Amino acid sequence: MKNWLDEIKWDADGLVPAIAQDHKTGRVLMMAWMNREALELTAAENRAIYWSRSRGKLWRKGEESGHVQTLHEMRLDCDADVIILMVEQIGDIACHTGRQSCFYRVFENGDWKTVDPVLKDPHAIYSAGHKHE
């Protein structure tokens, strides 16, 4: 029997990009990487678990901030090389900058313009020395 994880086209580092979207509004919240273990645990625990390339370890979204992403649905694209996670974003903050989405800048008139407000000061969210989930 074929394992569902074998259907994914992992990159040379054994990773696949994962896009988290709000399951109610469809808004793109963030993009992160998943390895096989992260994807398997995400399915098993019904919460987003990513692979932190900078720290070289699993990253359970919300483990420090409390901003957990509860999984509602998982989709695989037509090329089997991108995952979409339809999630409920607990606390309404997905970005380490304290915003709802990591995609808070819009290209306008040749420049990037910040269009989404900071909902909570990142220093109040994360412990000292921890800059980014």
UniProtKB/Swiss-Prot annotation:
Mg(2+) binds at D77, D79, D81. Zn(2+) binds at C78, C95, C102. It comes from the Bacteria. Its main location: cytoplasm. InterPro entries: PRA-CH, PRib_AMP_CycHydrolase_dom, PRib_AMP_CycHydrolase_sf. Binds 1 Mg(2+) ion per subunit. Binds 1 zinc ion per subunit. GO terms for molecular function: magnesium ion binding; phosphoribosyl-AMP cyclohydrolase activity; zinc ion binding. Pathway: Amino-acid biosynthesis; L-histidine biosynthesis; L-histidine from 5-phospho-alpha-D-ribose 1-diphosphate: step 3/9. Catalyzes the hydrolysis of the adenine ring of phosphoribosyl-AMP. Belongs to the PRA-CH family. This is Phosphoribosyl-AMP cyclohydrolase. It comes from Pseudomonas fluorescens (strain Pf0-1). The gene is hisI.
